[in-house]
Amino acid sequence: MSERGYELKGSVFTMTVLHLEDAIPEQIQQLLEQKASQAPKFFDSAPLVINVEMLTEIPDFSKIMSAILTANFIPVGVTGVKSNEMREAAKQARLAILTAGKETNTDAVVLHTPKESIYKTPSELREEQQTSPGTTADPDNLVPTKVVQGNVRSGQQIYSPGPVVILGSVSNGAEIISNDSIHVYGTLRGRALAGARGNHDARIFCGHLEAELISIAGHYLLSDSLPEPHVGQEVQISLENEKIIFDKLTS
């Protein structure tokens, strides 16, 4: 049989991990639905890994999977399996057995001292794209900056493969997605997903942080996990060593 057109390659994906302290399907479903309501589009059919490390008994994986699917997540595997019996039970439920990965610690938020504001005007962003030390700009490979005049209303979604600049505010229920960085000159109340294609150097800038969700290269925080000192402040958000970093900005 010819193998032309088929190829196996290794890859890395960022996925949400559900840590179980007990295995009550109703409570699992309630928790997931509550989280999904904070960012419906972000969690719509999102892959989910089940961490069973804290469980002392073999759970009913079929019922847990049903609860997860009802909450509109997709269970893809389990991690933290400590016995052959639990491993077999997971396999019988058609769940992959995953080794423990490097998880993002959403509680370990690094707070930096205030620094000079590094907001960029749209023209400055275009200049950065066109020139970098030791290189010559190739106009054919440039990704233009998307500039949105005014506010982004609830229910709107803005996407760009390049940087996104919002000259107004982003309302609750609105979503900004960029493969690069996101600049919001007003208040960020909705969702901002930078580095959507895995760009760990992408950043999020906003004049007033009240976001429902912020995400960089798949690493995310919901509104209830944002560090209190930065809520309502002018901030720069970046990713360093798999941790989301918040920097205060000054005018």
Curated annotation (Swiss-Prot):
Residue stretches of biased makeup (Basic and acidic residues): 119-129
GO biological process annotation, one example: cell morphogenesis
Gene3D superfamilies for the chain: 2.160.20.70, 3.30.70.260
Annotated spans, Disordered: 119-143
Keywords linked to the UniProt accession: Cell cycle, Cell division, Septation
Entry-linked InterPro entries: CAP/MinC_C, MinC, MinC_C_sf, MinC_N, Septum_form_inhib_MinC_C
Quaternary structure annotation from Swiss-Prot or TrEMBL: Interacts with MinD and FtsZ.
Family from the record: Belongs to the MinC family.
Protein purpose: Cell division inhibitor that blocks the formation of polar Z ring septums. Rapidly oscillates between the poles of the cell to destabilize FtsZ filaments that have formed before they mature into polar Z rings. Prevents FtsZ polymerization.
HAMAP family assigned to the protein according to its UniProt record, in alphabetical order: MinC (MF_00267)
Protein name in the entry: Probable septum site-determining protein MinC
